[in-house]
Amino acid sequence: MGLLTSLKDSISRVTEGLFASGEPKRIGIYGPPNAGKTTLANRIARDWTGDAVGPESHIPHETRRARRKEDVTIERNGKEVTIDIVDTPGVTTKVDYEEFLEHDMEKEDAVRRSREATEGVAEAMHWLREDVEGVIYVLDATQDPFTQVNTMLIGIIESQDLPVLILANKIDKEEADIQQIANAFPQHETIPLSALEGDNMDEVYEKIAEYFS
């Protein structure tokens, strides 16, 4: 009987360990266009897997379909979390093809890009409502965060009780104002960083491990 009990205990411990590890958590990277979402996704993926998620560009709506990088394991301060990064298209209330003409695009290409960007917004919202288990919300610290889109998205995230980490990106720029982002969403902690330069990424990784583990 003692041997049987010991065997059951051993099996139980192994089973608990397997279920404790679970599936990687799907963490969506959200924010307005050109906030640096893909730059951040690539920074995280390269730091922990050596691979990139997708191309980066100064032209708005470079990411027009959600891209996923699976099984990214982040370790900090004794905590470990494995996540699937979902780099989502920038969310906005209006996509105008004329915006792309300013970047020397032909009209046909600009119209196509604006259509794809609009579809990308819908896809990003679907991921938010149905599939992600946590959110990294990226804001450009050189821009005013008090916008309809930011307020709406943060409200949706909160209504779904999703853990959210707000990042004030582009602190490498002289005009960056971290405090305006902290003031816009005082109910959440704001972490400054430069995804492009890698500034303060250690703290970002600490918070990812803390928020999503």
Where are the language model's segments positioned?
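Charged, alpha-helix-enriched surfaces in structured cytosolic catalytic cores
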Residues: A35, T39, R64, Q148, ...
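Conserved C-terminal guanine-recognition region of P-loop GTPase G domains, centered on the G4
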Residues: R112-H188
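Canonical P-loop GTPase G-domain recognition
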Residues: K170-S213
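A solvent-exposed, charged loop/short amphipathic helix patch at secondary-structure junctions
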Residues: E99-S114
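Conserved P-loop NTPase architecture
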Residues: M1-F19, P24-G28, P33, F146-T147, ...
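Conserved nucleotide-binding/hydrolysis micro-motifs of P-loop NTPases
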Residues: E62, G90-T92, T142-D144, K170-E174, ...
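Conserved G1/Walker A P-loop phosphate-binding module
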Residues: G2-H103
